[in-house]
Regions:
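Generic alpha-helix signal with a bias toward terminal, lower-confidence helices
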Residues: 36, 54, 65, 69, ...
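Short, surface-exposed, charged/polar-biased interaction segments
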Residues: 40-44, 79-83, 141-143, 153
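N-terminal capping segments
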Residues: 1-67
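Helix N-terminus capping/helix-initiation residues
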Residues: 34-35, 74, 147
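Active-site signature of cysteine proteases
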Residues: 128-162
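Secondary-structure boundary/capping motif
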Residues: 57, 102, 118, 124, ...
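...with weaker cross-activation on analogous glycine-rich loops/strands in unrelated enzymes
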Residues: 10-18, 47, 67-139
Length: 162
């Protein structure tokens, strides 16, 4: 039987995912990182319209669930060592697959900028694929299916890392 802490963590994870699911379909007004709701995500992290907002969206979802962290608009900042449990090829290893939980944050590495440049929430994992909820994807919030080979890092902000 799961401990009280494990049950509370599971409930919180589902709350974050539920909040994110309600945002699916939110679109930018003009395709320039703008629009009423997009600007709300950005304001939550201290920015105004016109900035990339994938990290702001993730932070906003956590905030709506009552969590004070993460609250950062810069994607790489969501992956401190203490919270990150896989990087690079390690994310596809069998031991890591059992660690991935709903509301963990995934990061995609951008070769051109040589850092994580896109993030989102993990809804669940099916085989070697993550089902995700991401902001600033095709100018909107959407759910996607991503192969683990495309994932550079995974961080846990609810369970405190592993």
């Amino acid at each position: 039987m799961p401990s009280l802490q494990e049950r509370a963590e599971s409930t919180l994870r589902q709350e974050v995912i539920g909040i994110a699911l309600q945002e699916i379909g939110v679109r930018e007004a003009t395709g320039n990182n703008d629009g009423k709701r997009v600007e709300e995500y950005l304001r939550y992290t201290g920015l105004g319209k016109g900035y990339a907002w994938c990290s702001a969206f993730v932070s906003w979802c956590y905030g709506q669930a009552g969590l004070i962290e993460p609250r950062n608009p810069w994607s790489p900042a969501l992956f401190p060592n203490a919270r990150t449990y896989c990087r690079g090829d390690a994310c596809g290893r069998p031991i890591t697959l059992t660690q991935i939980k709903p509301a963990d944050i995934f990061g995609i590495y951008g070769q051109s900028v040589r850092r994580i440049n896109h993030v989102g929430l993990i809804k669940d994992i099916k085989g070697k694929y993550l089902r995700t909820i991401e902001g600033n994807s095709n100018n909107r919030v959407e759910s996607k299916r991503r192969h683990l080979s495309t994932i550079y890092a995974v961080a846990d902000w609810i369970g405190g890392g592993r």
